[in-house]
């Protein structure tokens, strides 16, 4: 495992730019934020909006193996079943996301034939129910259904609306029709329920309702019968099950959903009026009810409580078709009225002169009005009037010779009688991605009116609309859509858009989600260094960086190359939030622990502030170019503001490739499961099938790079033009390697059964930067192979992407990894010795891969589970004694390869033991021989003798010793022993010693010593000659003797005659003691 304080030992051999790791990394300087996983490409299709996710405090062990990649994702909106695809190289597997993982609406959840994004919405037309109108009307419609979707209209289900007054069920039904699936359910209440006050539950009674009681409404969906009708269930069938809260075990009824509540009043509903003041004396009461052709609308003329007027003239004008049919005096004993009415063909006019007694203002209640007249307006049957018709009012006072301003009132004429209007939208949520992309996001809207008989009329052309807060959401001029354009400053839950038609007003509630700013930029490595030994071609105008200063000038290859810089992966994350309507707190779409990957949305708006320092490639890979500090930015598409910023440092330091992890990929498998904490998030696991199970089955390899600074990156993020790879087989009987013309990666082909580190991957620099004198190999890695042939079965042929055959143990490991709650501090990565098996598992499960690397057709692949020999390890798993699969793996027999390895190990151990015995015997014999040499006069014996002297004649005539070829000889140098006398030589002689150790025995090296002795009296020069001699082994088996012997030490002339050790006798004693020690 490697982390912030981890320290690992490494032994590496570097020869000619080749790095072959022998262990694990030493003293990692930093921890990469990018774990080592299978670098598969994941793609979601058939989804209108979907996001990959990152979980806060995510378990690092979830992605800790080169064999698999685990990614959570979220489907925000989809009409058809989404499909997730995982691919790597030529292998691909896809899976349809099942409906149970999408958490679709419970109303349509049991009906698979409808789109996933359909939701049933309800709108109660009038929440106040009176005894004179004992009818509850609710409009149902389908969100997510297009206005023009007519394919599924014939299969739309029925809706049942029901309530439980006085412990009895009252129900009504309707069938969804057309697009977007509209119907109105009408629930009729019995008269006795109003008189009894509706004996409802105590908690449902609200005293503030002034005598009214609440009644809860519910609905459920069920299919229509063969005739297309919606018959209701038998009376009382639901009573004992739903009202009592019990559920019948014998029969499962459709799930019910709550609609809302209505208030039931025992009184009659009064007409609704609107007051219009003509001046401080006269007030007109305008009815708000719709008027159809042939009907009459009554207007009331009253005096205010403070009025003292007793005579005035009222002038009225109306459009043609609106006629004054009657004028009635409310108090004939108090007021008299003279009428002048003209119901002409072009205009209706009337003059009403009112005279009465002076009113008694003290007898009126404060704030009340004194009614004088009732004026009836009738609608002509042949007028074809529709909409609001204006009526003008003006009052004059003859005595005072004054006149009021002209006041306009309206009467609403309709061909039909509306009871309310309802705005319909295709969705009740808006995801404001316009802030990120600059592209507006809109939701179509329609407005329909519901008549008394339950029929629905489209009134979209004659409505008015206005947003309650345009900083959250806007509405189009013709009221046919609501939209966001990226200029909004806020987001909100249940923000309101008002729609008005005639005198009806309806509010549409919509939730707007917006990205939380600033965005978060995640870079796997924010410190990029040069990679030692990896040279890439550079442009002619850029000065190349030399790897070393001692390169020969005649080397033309590589002269236009510079060192490669490290690469890092980049992604942009954010959270979608909305403010709560009451407290103003933030509400998260998936919760505060989730971040959405929005890199694809902002790729074209990402840039590096200093492109000469670093460069973005495809918006997801950051490559260093030259040392410096710069920032990666996400710019706003609508302004010059910066939405996100991250600092990156490109260093002049050099790192080496410490490890090259290799993973065999013979196919792909894919599994899905809900997240343990939030069921709306789905966790996908894409795994590599690494067991070759049929002869000539093909596979490719995947590789990761571990650098000496601790960062890890997949090799795939580097440009293929900057490197080349060579894959070779270490056992041609098990696997062979074939060249692939369509890809840079060679193909591994199964030949026979076996397993182990049998493939070797060599990574080399590109051809333009190769040097002629040495092969620039950057790193070598070994990958593990497992070939186990199994008999094919016809029932597994076909190429369907079945994931049921994924190894059970691997699935359990991934499940445990996802379900893990804690222990984050120990979840760090492990890098093991190359080729060292981390486990050996047998596989019995099966899977298929749809495509082969060369032929591009379906082949049978059976899953072998996790690789038993991964170069970078999978997360370790302890055997569970309660798990039968673990017991099976533990108790299996040894394979032929394992038996051979154990036998070879025993032979090695035996050889080592014999070697140790020989060493002991040799040491014992050598000890006796040394004692024998000492008894013969302390004649020193050494392999390194040095002859020193100042007689020119002696030095210029080296001794020629010729040995018979049949005699046993050993090479020594005549002279003093090197280990004790090397301090007598000058420095230049010492430097050449290491080169002389590898010279042959007949090689004579001469060098003049230029230093003069301290007592030199002339220009005579000292000369030193190194000569190799031999020691002759006596025929009688006695002790070794030298081929050239000297009588005494007096014949030796030393280079340094005075060592400061005292007189000559002391020096001789010192030398004799050293010889005795040898």
Swiss-Prot record:
Pfam families: Ig_TMEM132_2nd, Ig_TMEM132_4th, Ig_TMEM132_5th, Ig_TMEM132_6th, TMEM132_3rd, TMEM132_C, TMEM132_N
Presence of keyword Membrane: yes
Similarity comment: Belongs to the TMEM132 family.
InterPro entries with a match to the protein in the record: Ig_TMEM132_2nd, Ig_TMEM132_5th, Ig_TMEM132_6th, TMEM132, TMEM132_3rd, TMEM132_C, TMEM132_M, TMEM132_N
Compartment(s) of residence: Membrane
Protein name according to UniProt: Transmembrane protein 132B
Transmembrane portions of the chain: 904-924
Primary localization: membrane
Residues carrying covalently attached carbohydrate according to the record: 343, 366, 381
Topology with respect to the bilayer: Single-pass type I membrane protein
Bias kind Polar residues: ranges: 841-852
Species of provenance: Homo sapiens
GO cellular component: membrane
Swiss-Prot/TrEMBL keywords: Glycoprotein, Membrane, Transmembrane, Transmembrane helix
Keyword Transmembrane helix: yes
Topological domains, Extracellular: 1-903
Region (Disordered): 834-887
Residue intervals annotated with topology Cytoplasmic: 925-1078
Signal peptide: none
